Amino acid sequence: MNPIRRRKIEAEAVRTVAMMILSGKVKDPRVHMVSVHRAEISEDGKNMKVFVTAICTDKKKLKVLSGLNSAAGLFQTTLSGKLGLRITPRMQFLWDEEYIQSLDESLRLTRKPTSAD
């Protein structure tokens, strides 16, 4: 797949998923207050990983991912319709550990040292 086309599909996937969650089109109660960070489509365009986070416990995190993965068909259909895709990528939702780590690192660097440090 052309790299420019791939980036366009990934960007539209992030926008589409975020918009559908925020607008309430996803009725699953497990899916709320979710941030969509990035998407990665495979070379052949058949699979897509969508990376998300939410402010929640580890137990709730599994429920959020389960809710998103159960709504994947809705997201895929909407994305395919928007972009006119011949092959609709199968979406898999994953927790964005990389984003969490970078956020933790940023917080650690900006934290002011105290007398205990």
Curated annotation (Swiss-Prot):
Disulfide bonds: none annotated. Signal peptide: none annotated. Its main location: cytoplasm. It is found in: Cytoplasm. One of its GO terms (cellular component) is cytosol. GO terms for molecular function: ribosomal small subunit binding. Keywords: Cytoplasm, Ribosome biogenesis. InterPro entries: KH_dom-like_a/b, RbfA, RbfA_dom_sf, Ribosome-bd_factorA_CS. GO terms for biological process: maturation of SSU-rRNA. Monomer. Binds 30S ribosomal subunits, but not 50S ribosomal subunits or 70S ribosomes. NCBIfam families: rbfA (TIGR00082). Belongs to the RbfA family. This is Ribosome-binding factor A. It comes from Leptospira borgpetersenii serovar Hardjo-bovis (strain JB197). The lineage of its organism: Bacteria, Pseudomonadati, Spirochaetota, Spirochaetia, Leptospirales. The gene is rbfA.
